[in-house]
Amino acid sequence: IDPPRYCNHIICYEDSECSQWCTAGCNSITSKCDT
């Protein structure tokens, strides 16, 4: 399973599926979740 293609900080904190991928936060360059 790949991390969500697009994320922002609100999505990372509020969306449980995204937040499990965003353990290292959102990559501001690629707009992807870092694991």
Curated annotation (Swiss-Prot):
It comes from Gemmula speciosa (Splendid gem-turris). Its main location: secreted. One of its GO terms (cellular component) is extracellular region. Coiled coil: none annotated. The modification 4-carboxyglutamate is found at residues 14, 17. The cysteine framework is IX (C-C-C-C-C-C). This is Turripeptide gsp9a. Expressed by the venom duct.
